[in-house]
């Protein structure tokens, strides 16, 4: 599933082509995605100018005066800006045509993505109750320490809780915990403020660097220009169970934590 760096890469690729453009029309070929596409998308978007392309957590928002189209890529979704006469491929479910003859095309083979509508002045229910963005100043060791008190869940599960911080999925949680030297199994409520500061710093560094590398290509993700992400080539622990730890050379451990595959070094991460 695309995580924050992949979604931010998509946003940065789309924004120059969409911001300031007016929507000419919307074609819905399949509305039965993870959630049915509401009629407001086709009813409200045409004629509206796209004022901004934003990201909140793993959602993309196309802001207009009437409201925002809220997009989630799901497991396999992709968004590309194409010439208006580009032939259809399998799983091309939605076209948003623009006033310059180009279009934004949403392709989603597995149909776990979504395209929803947020009226102006409202916050969509899916965007309510979310934690801070991990790259914002509000996300630091003090914040993690305060939120973790009394929490007995493993720190990896805690870090992936969208109510705690948004956009840190399985890949980047594993890499951040490794860089911070914290075992994913350690109880969240038993980690010191100092160690949480190291973890917050690691999350910011790894996510920021992954964005510059175009995200991580695992199976399905490609950026809007069709290029893969390159951060996968630099993963230190994720997907490397049984291989030598890049720090100490011992075999990396594997376990299921919170129903997610987890890999770590039991020597370097405590």
Curated annotation (Swiss-Prot):
Keywords: DNA damage, DNA repair, DNA-binding, Glycosidase, Hydrolase, Lyase, Metal-binding, Multifunctional enzyme, Zinc, Zinc-finger. This is Formamidopyrimidine-DNA glycosylase. One of its GO terms (biological process) is base-excision repair. It comes from the Bacteria. Belongs to the FPG family. One of its GO terms (molecular function) is 8-oxo-7,8-dihydroguanine DNA N-glycosylase activity. Involved in base excision repair of DNA damaged by oxidation or by mutagenic agents. Acts as a DNA glycosylase that recognizes and removes damaged bases. Has a preference for oxidized purines, such as 7,8-dihydro-8-oxoguanine (8-oxoG). Has AP (apurinic/apyrimidinic) lyase activity and introduces nicks in the DNA strand. Cleaves the DNA backbone by beta-delta elimination to generate a single-strand break at the site of the removed base with both 3'- and 5'-phosphates. Binds 1 zinc ion per subunit. InterPro entries: DNA_glyclase/AP_lyase_DNA-bd (IPR015886), DNA_glyclase_Znf_dom_DNA_BS (IPR015887), Formamido-pyr_DNA_Glyclase (IPR020629), FPG_cat (IPR012319), MutM-like_N-ter (IPR035937), Ribosomal_uS13-like_H2TH (IPR010979), Znf_DNA_glyclase/AP_lyase (IPR000214), Znf_FPG/IleRS (IPR010663). Monomer. It comes from Stenotrophomonas maltophilia (strain R551-3). The active site is at residues 2-3, 58, 260. Its EC number is 3.2.2.23, 4.2.99.18. The keyword DNA damage applies. It catalyses: Hydrolysis of DNA containing ring-opened 7-methylguanine residues, releasing 2,6-diamino-4-hydroxy-5-(N-methyl)formamidopyrimidine; 2'-deoxyribonucleotide-(2'-deoxyribose 5'-phosphate)-2'-deoxyribonucleotide-DNA = a 3'-end 2'-deoxyribonucleotide-(2,3-dehydro-2,3-deoxyribose 5'-phosphate)-DNA + a 5'-end 5'-phospho-2'-deoxyribonucleoside-DNA + H(+). The keyword DNA repair applies. Its cofactor is Zn(2+). DNA binds at residues 91, 110, 151. Transmembrane segments: none annotated. A zinc finger (FPG-type) spans 236-270.
């Amino acid at each position: 599933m695309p995580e924050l760096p992949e979604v931010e890469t998509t946003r940065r690729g789309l924004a120059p082509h969409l911001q300031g453009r007016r929507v000419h029309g919307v074609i819905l070929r399949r509305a039965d995605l993870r959630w049915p596409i509401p009629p407001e998308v086709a009813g409200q978007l045409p004629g509206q100018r796209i004022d901004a392309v934003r990201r909140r957590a793993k959602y993309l928002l196309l802001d207009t005066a009437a409201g925002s189209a809220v997009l989630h890529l799901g497991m396999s979704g992709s968004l590309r800006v194409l010439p208006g006469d580009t032939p259809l491929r399998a799983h091309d479910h939605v076209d948003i045509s623009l006033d310059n003859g180009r279009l934004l095309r949403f392709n989603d083979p597995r149909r776990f993505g979504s395209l929803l509508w947020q009226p102006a002045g409202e916050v969509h229910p899916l965007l309510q109750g979310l934690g801070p963005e991990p790259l914002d100043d509000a996300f630091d060791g003090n914040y993690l320490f305060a939120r973790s008190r009394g929490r007995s869940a493993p720190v990896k599960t805690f870090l992936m809780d969208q109510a705690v911080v948004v956009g840190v999925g399985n890949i980047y949680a594993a890499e951040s915990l490794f860089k911070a030297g914290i075992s994913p199994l350690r109880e969240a409520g038993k980690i010191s403020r100092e160690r949480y500061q190291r973890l917050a710093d690691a999350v910011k560094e790894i996510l920021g660097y992954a964005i510059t590398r175009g995200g991580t290509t695992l199976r399905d993700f490609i950026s809007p220009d069709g290029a893969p992400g390159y951060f996968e080539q630099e993963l230190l622990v994720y997907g490397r169970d049984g291989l030598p730890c890049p720090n100490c050379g011992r075999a990396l451990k594997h376990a299921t934590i919170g129903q997610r595959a987890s890999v770590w070094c039991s020597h370097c991460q405590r």
